[in-house]
Every structure is written in C-alpha cells, then in structure tokens.
Amino acid sequence: MSKVSEDARKKYLETIQDYKKTIEDIENREKLILQVMEKDATGSEYKKLRLAEENLNLLSYYVLMNNLSVSLLGVKNEGYLNEARKLCYKVVIYMEQVVSNVIDGPWSDYEDKVALISSFDYQDRWKLITKMGLAIQLVLTGYGDNTKWKWAFVELEARYATVVKNLLNLKTLFQDMDPNAEGYDIKTAHLTLARRLLEQSANKYREKFELSTLRFDDFRLAIKYLGALRYLALAVNKATEAENIKKKMDIWQQKLDNDLKRKDIAEKQ
C-alpha cells in the first residue's frame, strides 16, 4: 500500500471533525432521553423508538467516517466499523424491548407490547425497518467478505428479522393483504421483507451450524426461524405454504435428533 500523504491525512482529520461533533450531539440527546425515562416511564416505548432512530443516525456517521478513511487514506478504519457494528446491536436491542424478541411464539405472546405503539403507523414502521436493514448492510459491506465477524452477523441479522416480523400486526394481517386496504403496498412490502429475512435466518443458522460452530443451539434456532415463517403463512391464510414449512421443520428436526443421537453414542464409546 502506498504511503498516505500528509495532505490526505490532514484533509481526512479536518473533514471528520464536524462529524465527531455531530456524534457528540447525538450521544448527548440520548443521555437526556434516558434521564427523562428514568424519572417517568410514561411513553417509554415511543422514547425507545426515538432512541433507535437516534442511534441509526449515529451509526451512519461512523460508516461515513470509515468510508472517508477508505477513499482518502486507502485503508479501512476498524475502530469506526466496530462502533457501527455495536450500534447495530444497540438499535436491535431497543426494538426488542419495544416489540419483544419472540421468534416463533404466537401473536398473543407479544400482542400487548405491540399495542403500546399503535400510533406508530405502518409508514413509520416501514421507514424504520428499511433504515435498520440498510445500516446492517452498510456495516457488512464496510468489513468486506472475509471479515472475522461473518458468523456473528448471522445472529444480528436474525434478531433484526425477528423485530421486522414483530412489528407486523398478525391479528389484522390477513385483512391488510386486501388490495383495497389502506397502506396495502407498504404492508405487503413489510410482510414480504419479513418472510425473506426469516427464511434467510433459518438457512444461515443451519449453514453456521454445519460450516462453523457445530453447536446444536444454532440448528435449533434455524428451526425456530422456520417456525416464525410458518406463523406468517398461517396469519395470511396460506395453509398449503404453512404445511410445506411444517414438513421442512420436521425434516430438519429429524436431522437434529439423529445428530444428537450420534453425538451421544460417540461420547459413550
């Protein structure tokens, strides 16, 4: 790699100064919101939605500073990428606190939590989840294909998928799929995204099990994400699709059971 010129380094440091000030301002706003929540928990769900948005904005500046490092200095800034990655988790955690982290449980398991943000409409939900997805993708792209965090992102993306799914109102989802219903296009896009992400999470957890960890908990999570996908199929009255997913779950469960038996036999020998 060619030596970075002093002019390029100076330009980089000057450019990111404004971004660092903005980062400080966002962090101070978050502290103020958290202080308010400590004194009064009223409307805490909406405040956490605000905190998720603030941290997505914060994350974007770390991504931007890394991109500037690449373009001006010719090198990735792992420190900024790591901060962005941590913020991805922070945003997901805020959202899990709002709509729960229930993967394959029934709507009744988290219905009460989602009801608390009823005025957070379908348009705002769509904007937030697409912004979250873009943020995760930008961080992944920043690290590159050969990152040591490859398998860690399987969990992050799966937790994001759960949040996307849990922001759907499964009680009204079938009616929402009527082309004449208000917000049909956005709600359909939301459902399509949730289904794609859940299937992707199932496949990636199985891949993680087979190619990396050999941890049975990863295989169990793969099956749970298929279960979540099945719940969505049932919610929109797609019985045949739900049955096909159930068959796939049974096949995967049988493989898991067989692997567990083989492991048990091997340990006893």
Predicted segments — roles?
Residues 30, 81, 88, 95, ...:
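Inward-facing hydrophobic residues that define packing positions of alpha-helical scaffold repeats
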Residues 117-123, 143, 250-269:
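Alpha-helical linker/edge segments of TPR/alpha-solenoid repeat scaffolds
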